[in-house]
Amino acid sequence: MAAGVRANRLAKPARPTQAPARVIHFYGLTQAPGPSAESFRDLKGVDGAAPVEPLACAGLICWISRVPEAEFAENLSKNMQDLDWLAAATIRHQQVVSAIAQAGDVLPARFGIEFLNDESLRSHIESRDFFQWL
């Protein structure tokens, strides 16, 4: 009987894998229309994988990547204590800011500014309180 139970357990269909939750990593602002997103299509973001994207915000362009929430929100403080992780992530952040600056004027953001979603970022930019954080 135990073998039958085991066989049934193994026969269960696998659950579909859900994509990991993402947060917004913010690199900086440019004036609209800003550099073309196409110029950065091969550039990888702070996590080494996510593309760099423009996001329209209050008449400006916010440059962002959608990065894993577990790494850049839930565990950011812990990860920042890991000097290897911190060095790699901050270098990638700076490389993105430098690439944007080569295409035009940019107001860079410091490393570690994350938002839950597009609306959260837009709200902060529109409130102008955000500029105290830069």
Pin down the residues of each PLM region.
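An interfacial alpha-helical scaffold signature
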Residues: 2-134
